[in-house]
């Protein structure tokens, strides 16, 4: 039953991801609700099947092609195509025994019908004799790296060009495994030490992150139940270390006027409010009504009472004639720093997306700059590792607007920026055990 339910959810999830471009999390939630499957064991297995088969999409498609060169994978219906990906992961990558492979195939036939899978039966049989290394025969260097690290070939070539071969391979390999889970203890709910002690009594092991106020890592082996009582009560926020870094770098003071631009779903807003001790005003802007609705729920859960939401497109003037002491901009980006957590993102983006996003980011930065008071702080962050979306955006912005200059960021974690921007900070998944990230802090000065 567990395998059948998990497989049903996984196949449906992959199909929704492909048809509507949903993320793994969105598609999994939709599929489990649609099918009425709530068993946690089945959902965990479904999540693993989805994440790991999506992570290895290029390797899996190569193995399917080798098993049957006449097979046109993209011509298959969504259901059989999704099952073929999952089956290849299960039998070749996990290297299960013959009995497990047969049981898996039987579950697939029951789910989709034997007629739907009949064109793939020969392919499925051949795959039992394959190993992942089978896909590397006659591959070029960049193709081999792409298949070994599970990335598009163009992205491998981009990383090698930007970071050098050895650093690139380290970055790419880091995407194979999601980083640790981090939490932020919410002192708007209760005293930090009290919350930490309560969690420890419940058997949750925490590691304080050096130099980062209120931020803790969770033991990889124990993890955190997704709907634990501490999350529901607002005592903690599950938030990547990199995201927490933005709020700390902003250095908001109690009583400040803060703009949080592209703010939803609200993790940064709530941390800014925490650092301000719920004193002052935060104006949070986002373009999505749906995300603003989530933001409102998050502010209530996290005990934030100084933040106001505004529906706005940050590429245009913000709808407030007020100057900010601190403005935080976390614009849309390629998400190339989050491939370990959201592997589907790496198969959606193209090289040209780096330039496309950089144009949007620069447009937003130019608009936001006009809202920062003299002596005020402007913080820019992305969860991308591309130079185009980070150093080149900042370099261009500073060239266009001499009112701003870079300042040192505290705490000083990660590495310095590229292209000589030593005051910017970069976080790398293989070094910092978090999402890939970029951060720049600037002060508005007199001309």
Language model segments and positions:
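C-terminal catalytic and target-recognition region of SAM-dependent MTase-like enzymes
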Residues: 315-328, 332-334, 340-341, 355, ...
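Conserved SAM-dependent methyltransferase scaffold
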Residues: 269-273
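SAM-dependent Rossmann-like transferase core, predominantly class I methyltransferases
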Residues: 222-257
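Class I Rossmann-like S-adenosyl-L-methionine
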Residues: 1-223
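Glycine-rich S-adenosyl-L-methionine
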Residues: 287, 345-373
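S-adenosyl-L-methionine
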Residues: 285-322
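Conserved class I S-adenosyl-L-methionine
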Residues: 255-262, 283
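Helix-to-beta-strand junctions that scaffold the AdoMet/dcAdoMet cofactor pocket
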Residues: 276-277, 372-374
